[in-house]
Amino acid sequence: MPTIALYNMNREKIGEVALDEQIFAAEVKEPLIHQALKVQLANRRAGTVKTKTRAEVSGGGKKPFKQKGTGNARQGCSRAPQYPGGGTVFGPQPKTYNLGINKKARKAALRSLLSMQLKSEKITVLDQIEFAKISTKDFAGFMKKFDLERSLIITEEPSTNLALSSRNVPYVKLLKADGLNVFDVLKYQNIVMTEGAVRLVEGALQ
C-alpha cells in the first residue's frame, strides 16, 4: 500500500497517510487519459459560431441595376457572396461538439493520472489548509514555503478565507474534491490535497 508524508502548513512532517493502491498505484492507461481529455475539451466548446447566408442577410431585395445595357455582369441581388456585405458561402453554422465517455473509463483515467503524479512526487498532502484571515500575502508565503508554483489545490470544502486569499495568485486553482477532472490535473505541475480531500477522491474513484 503506497504512503505519502503528511505535513502541516509550516511544512513540518506530522505523520504519513496510507493511500488506496487502486487509486494511487493503478496501471497507467494513456489512451484513456487522452480520450477523457478529448471529451472534456470538446464539451467545453459552445458551438455557437454562425455566419449568415445570402438568404439571411438583411436587405438586397432589389435588383442592383437593370439586366442589360450597362456593360456589367448581370446581378440579381446586392447581398450575393461576391458583394461586400453579402452572405457567406458554406460558412460555419451552430453545432454541438459534445462527446461522451463511460463513467468507468473516466474514473480509470483519473486513477491513471493520480498514480502518475504520485510516482513523479508531484502530490503534497496537508492535514488542513486554513487561514485566519483573508490575505493574499499569507497565501503566497504558504506556497513559497512548499516551493509550489503551478498548483492545483484540492480540499473538501474551501473556506471563504482560503478562496479569497488564493484567487488573485496566478497559476493556482482551488478545486473541491468532487470537481476533480483530467484537464486540471494535467494542466498544473503540482497537486496539493488535504487529508480529507484524499479520502473523498478515493471514495469517488472506487
Curated annotation (Swiss-Prot):
Coiled-coil annotated spans: none
InterPro entries according to UniProt: Ribosomal_uL4 (IPR002136), Ribosomal_uL4-like (IPR013005), Ribosomal_uL4_dom_sf (IPR023574)
Family: Belongs to the universal ribosomal protein uL4 family.
Domain of life: Bacteria
GO terms for cellular component: ribonucleoprotein complex; ribosome
GO biological process annotation, one example: translation
NCBIfam families per UniProt: rplD_bact
Protein name: Large ribosomal subunit protein uL4
Entry keyword set: Ribonucleoprotein, Ribosomal protein, RNA-binding, rRNA-binding
Known function: One of the primary rRNA binding proteins, this protein initially binds near the 5'-end of the 23S rRNA. It is important during the early stages of 50S assembly. It makes multiple contacts with different domains of the 23S rRNA in the assembled 50S subunit and ribosome.
SUPFAM superfamilies from the UniProt entry: Ribosomal protein L4
PANTHER family in UniProt: 50S RIBOSOMAL PROTEIN L4, LARGE RIBOSOMAL SUBUNIT PROTEIN UL4M
Keyword flag Ribonucleoprotein: yes
Subunit structure: Part of the 50S ribosomal subunit.
Stretches for region Disordered: 50-89
Gene Ontology MF: a single term: structural constituent of ribosome
